[in-house]
Amino acid sequence: MSFFKNQLIHRARPGYRIIPESTVTEDIELGTIGEETPLLSEGVITAVEEGAIGLPEVAIGVAGAIGTHAHEWWRDRYAFKSVLTGNYTDLKGNPLKPRNAIPEKIKQLGKKIFQGDFNRAFPDNLKLETEKEKADLLRYYNHNRRLAGLSEAYPQGKGYAYAKSQKVLEAERRGLTVPGYKYLGPGNSLNRGQPINQIDEDAKEHDEAYDKVKTSQEVSRADNTFVNKALDHVVNAINFKETPGNAFGAAIGAIGIGTKQAIEKYSGVIYPSVSGMSRHINPRYINQPNWKDYIAEGNSKNWVGYSNLPDDFFQEETLSDSPMQEATKRKADSPAVETPAKKGTTGVNVNSQSTDPQNPSSSGATTDLDVTMAMSLPGTGSGTSSGGGNTQGQDVYIIPRPFSNFGKKLSTYTKSHKFMIFGLANNVIGPTGTGTTAVNRLLTTCLAEIPWQKLPLYMNQSEFDLLPPGSRVVECNVKVIFRTNRIAFETSSTVTKQATLNQISNVQTAIGLNKLGWGINRAFTAFQSDQPMIPTATTAPKYEPVTGDTGYRGMIADYYGADSTNDTAFGNAGNYPHHQVSSFTFLQNYYCMYQQTNQGTGGWPCLAEHLQQFDSKTVNNQCLIDVTYKPKMGLIKSPLNYKIIGQPTVKGTISVGDNLVNMRGAVVTNPPEATQNVAESTHNLTRNFPADLFNIYSDIEKSQVLHKGPWGHENPQIQPSVHIGIQAVPALTTGALLINSSPLNSWTDSMGYIDVMSSCTVMEAQPTHFPFSTEANTNPGNTIYRINLTPNSLTSAFNGLYGNGATLGNV
């Protein structure tokens, strides 16, 4: 690559206005910053200089581009002149006025103050010796701020530091594009936003294919695919099936690829610089001891101020015609090269990507760190190898290590349920209390529970049974859509009740009531005989099958039906699968506040503070709840085992340097706050798991029960509850309620209809480290242990966690 072409390509980086990185940039008026400047194709420059193609081929490509975007080319004609001549002007051709140079003292002061971050405000309270120094520092600040393109490219506070860390500026500057497009052109970044049109989308796919190729055959395949798509666009435009814009871009793209292929007939396949792939230092110089210190010094300065380097010092990565990667080939001995002592330095820039070993510029490059490490190994000195040949100048050959990537499979289970809920009235129920005895009291509500902590809401029995050991829920989501409500009234009753259609009805929603500890979910078993909206008796919530007169066939049978093979209930009348036929069924459990008499608590807390209420007439067919939860320990199948190896197999006592806090429990006794105690209890970890811990009805979140690894902290949590309800609607009567101060105890039959979209994501993996193991296995750190406690989620929470107290019986 000649000096002329090297400098022209360096200047022809598209993106923001081109200002060379030298002291001159601080002595000129910058003009407009942030406008895109289309420039000449690097491929065309190379072809013309080296004579790889003839003038007709060049003329076709250039003429096509000029004909399509003549306006843009004419508008930016002064930009081309600036690049080719080095005399920089603005977009109107006006010369950039010289300014007084900023003193070196101010530059060094600015570097210390701003440290490359010009997104911060200019510190007006700086105390300098003279006002001129402060003015010069402000010029330094404004220049670098404008040069970074902050005001145009990052107006939302994403300044220079952010852009530099994300390599945004480099991505926007990289490559060449046809004016009006983002990806149609060689060597572009893959992160330039949404394509302009379909041919621009095809060009992006072409660049993405380039990013993954490893052989020249794959390059040709990507080129041919793009050309075929481009020709299709042209044909479709002729037949009026597409807009002319696609045809223009397609013609330019096809001509460009054709020109590239013509060049490659003589030069071979040239790997384009896409997605961060750029030039690197030739390994033959890296491997020379007398170049090592010189290269390290150049890398530290990003090669600013270095010139007169050999023409092949920086090289583009080229592809082999063989599928074998370049890094695995052994090259012939390299001829002697000049040492850095024979080279001089001037102030001309050499723009090269960093060769920092932490961020290598290409997979085929070898850094000085790699060479140092390789030469320090026994038997790999700089002398002759075991075969007698000189290994100096060769790439390091790394032998691939065996590795099995078992991966993780993510499966998503989604169900759509239809439920009916009732506008139940508030009622205090419980036995009559006498004297100082603590008596249970429940205050019923209309809030029906969405059982999203249970697996049947997301999957049927077969889907659950087919999951392998170690499967766990990583995310679950429910969306609750309120469809409408129905208010019933009697039309043939006596004159004591009036029929009307304009009653007000409210919808209530709540998330996380279980964490309050104010109440529990209950299933209602009896209602007042003349008022069906008033519950009078409750029992424990129903999820699994419950026998008896007030039983329940369970969520699985309710939603998905019975097994036709061996389930005796399959043929029973009414036992049809509601989910399978998209039919309405009922939510079984409702939230009740819980209190005991004679405990000194002072009445019922304000539940309304934690409710969201809507006018039901305004939210028909609206999604009122959309909540997502990521379990901390969502294991739903038996955990993977580990295989104990090493001597001794019985490990004995291991010092872990800390208490095993995960094995502790808190015993909370004596409800009155004056005498309440919280004492510590210790429990051993075990690998013994109860049969019901991993059945389909167990809670998804198990971080209170299970622990990952033999020691360490777990910080358990519980899944927040989800409730929705229709507030009870009073019945209109002629009774003298106001005169006699009678309680409002007459309610209209009301019902609501909701749709529940439930979705959960399950992760599964089946790794093994042993060649003859018959089951998946893992290491001790990923092994799941159980704490010998059984929290009861049917009780109320204390400080955000469940205790192991007994379930409340029938009340």
UniProtKB/Swiss-Prot annotation:
Q: Which domain of life is it from?
A: Viruses
Return the InterPro entries for the record.
Capsid/spike_ssDNA_virus, Capsid_VP4_densovirus, Phospholipase_A2-like, PLipase_A2_dom_sf
Composition skew (Polar residues), residue ranges: 346-366
Q: Name one GO molecular function term.
A: phospholipase A2 activity
Q: Name one Pfam family in it.
A: Phospholip_A2_4
Q: Where in the cell is it found?
A: Virion
Which keywords fit this entry according to its UniProt record?
Answer: Capsid protein, Clathrin-mediated endocytosis of virus by host, Host-virus interaction, T=1 icosahedral capsid protein, Viral attachment to host cell, Viral penetration into host cytoplasm, Viral penetration via permeabilization of host membrane, Virion, Virus endocytosis by host, Virus entry into host cell
Q: Does the keyword Cell inner membrane apply?
A: no
Q: Where is this region: Disordered?
A: 321-367
GO biological process assignments: arachidonate secretion; clathrin-dependent endocytosis of virus by host cell; phospholipid metabolic process; symbiont entry into host cell via permeabilization of host membrane; virion attachment to host cell
Gene Ontology terms, cellular component aspect? T=1 icosahedral viral capsid
Q: What does this protein do?
A: Capsid protein self-assembles to form an icosahedral capsid with a T=1 symmetry, about 22 nm in diameter, and consisting of 60 copies of size variants of the capsid proteins, which differ in the N-terminushe capsid encapsulates the genomic ssDNA. Capsid proteins are responsible for the attachment to host cell receptors. This attachment induces virion internalization predominantly through clathrin-dependent endocytosis.
Its domain description in UniProt is: The N-terminus of VP1 is sequestered within the mature capsid. It contains a phospholipase A2-like region and putative nuclear localization signals.
Q: What is this protein called?
A: Capsid protein VP1
Underlying gene: VP
